[in-house]
Amino acid sequence: MTVTYTARVANARFGGFSQLLLLWRGSIYKLLWRELLCFLGLYMALSAAYRFLLAEEQKRYFEKLVIYCDQYASLIPVSFVLGFYVTLVVHRWWNQYLCMPLPDALMCIVAGTVHGRDDRGRLYRRTLMRYAGLSAVLILRSVSTAVFKRFPTIDHVVEAGFMTREERKKFENLNSSYNKYWVPCVWFSSLAAQARREGRIRDNSALKLLLEELNVFRSKCGMLFHYDWISIPLVYTQVVTIAVYSYFLACLIGRQFLDPAQGYKDHTLDLCVPIFTLLQFFFYAGWLKVAEQLINPFGEDDDDFETNFLIDRNFQVSMLAVDEMYDDLAMLEKDLYWDAAEARAPYTAATAFLLQQPSFQGSTFDIALAKEDMQFQRLDGVDGPLGEVHGDFLQRLLPAGAGSVGPLGRRLSLLRRKNSCVSEASTAASCGCAGAADGGGVECGCGDPLLDPSLREPELEPPACPEPPAPIPGPTPEPFTTVSIPGPRAPAPPWLPSPIGEEEESPA
């Protein structure tokens, strides 16, 4: 039922989409031709009545009605309402497809974790996958009309081989008025636990992996049920439908061609068929038809999901994976590129031109810079001493006017001047410093009057430390203290577990 045209648009070429306009199955023409003919018929009937049936006075009144409808029909926000609605429907449609229960991951885990080449192991694997397929069939026949027509009763499910008669009895004996698509998943988990107890599943990690994948499969079945149960709010669908239909009902009257002799504005041309009004109806009504077809993809429209095909494919593939393909491996051989330093698959003559194209290295790989632009530069503010940078930072933290008043501000200024002088002396650029002969302060030739030794703040002398007390006469203490080592512990009672590491412990 799905219309596939992917191969037709594999390459972009002149008129690539034009050939798709000639397709009939799944086309907009197939969906809309009845509504389009109905709209055109009503339009032509009103036009004929205006031209041939109405009296002159009635024609004047009809012309006023045409002008009124044409003026106020644009107040209906058709594009706005349709745009949001169709976006919501398409998003919902794709999410429903992503919730289709596919057994591919589950069958790989079953084939890798449930072991045994005998009939018992084979029975476990086939039954597990049959339960998964049964759960998918039960949920799809609940939401898809095509699947329900194929399996209208549980008897048809039993005859198709998805359920045994004993399982049907257990299924029908469950006292529940709700949908029981989840019952085969419970059977699956119980059978997997039984296989673990028998050793078919060798560890709990494998059982955990199997049940986690089963929960993913079951959650997809549950989401299909909820998508079928919770629809797009009816009021939204009604608003969109009423907006589109009322707009074109107004267009039936407002887009009529009037008598040019009356001199109405924008009515200087008299035609029989409204070409652009029909195109507008085709686009807007076709937009609504898109939402109408995609809102439930589990029907029997041309573009609905191939649910019966998926049931057949999933059942056959899952049985092949866990039965005939189980532990069936080809002999291990060295590949063609075993001794090759660089493995490269060959190209045909039709694709040999791809070898001439360079591999992508990154968007900045081919950027070229001038030689002078590639030289590292020292950052401004880092060349100075670290103390100067810290001093500037502390100065910014002080309140306004506090940098020059008080001992802290004077010390920060003095520290900044000292660092500046030492930095200039080390580079020998413009300042020469020499120590005084009498051991006084440093003389700098920087020309800064603030560096005069007489203006410096006197340094505080450290307080005199008291002399240490005289030693007390007495015996000289030993340099080390002797500590007695305890003997080995007594053996513990036999009913107590031995502490960790006691076997390696030896008496000191």
From Swiss-Prot:
Catalysed reactions, as listed in the record: chloride(in) = chloride(out); hydrogencarbonate(in) = hydrogencarbonate(out); L-glutamate(out) = L-glutamate(in); iodide(out) = iodide(in)
Record's keyword terms, sorted: Calcium, Cell membrane, Chloride, Chloride channel, Ion channel, Ion transport, Membrane, Metal-binding, Transmembrane, Transmembrane helix, Transport
Subunit relationships: Pentamer. Interacts with GLUL; this interaction tethers a fraction of GLUL to the membrane, causing a decrease of cytosolic glutamine synthase (GS) activity and inhibits the chloride channel activity of BEST2 by affecting the gating at the aperture in the absence of intracellular glutamate.
Record's signal peptide: none
Cytoplasmic side: 1-31, 83-238, 289-508
Name of the featured protein: Bestrophin-2
Membrane topology category: Multi-pass membrane protein
GO molecular function, one term: bicarbonate channel activity
Gene Ontology cellular-component terms listed: basolateral plasma membrane; chloride channel complex; cilium; plasma membrane
Regulation: Chloride channel activity is allosterically inhibited by GLUL/glutamine synthase (GS) which affects the gating at the aperture in the absence of intracellular glutamate. Inhibitory effect of GLUL is relieved upon increasing of intracellular level of L-glutamate.
Entry text on domains: The C-terminal auto-inhibitory segment (AS) modulates the open/closed conformation of the channel and determines paralog specificity among bestrophins. In a closed conformation, the C-terminal auto-inhibitory segment constricts the channel concentrically by wrapping around the channel periphery in an inter-protomer manner.
Subcellular location: Cell membrane; Basolateral cell membrane
Functional note: Ligand-gated anion channel that allows the movement of anions across cell membranes when activated by calcium (Ca2+). Transports a large specter of anions, namely mediates the movement of chloride, L-glutamate and iodide. Calcium-binding triggers the dilation of the aperture, but calcium-dependent gating is only effective when the size of the passing anion is bigger than the closed aperture. Mediates the calcium-activated hydrogencarbonate movement and participates in colonic hydrogencarbonate secretion concomitant with mucin secretion.
Biased composition (Pro residues): 461-478, 488-497
Topology Extracellular: residue spans: 52-60, 256-274
Record-level GO BP terms: bicarbonate transport; chloride transmembrane transport; chloride transport; membrane depolarization; sensory perception of smell
Transmembrane segments: 32-51, 61-82, 239-255, 275-288
Main location: membrane
The family this protein is said to belong to: Belongs to the anion channel-forming bestrophin (TC 1.A.46) family. Calcium-sensitive chloride channel subfamily.
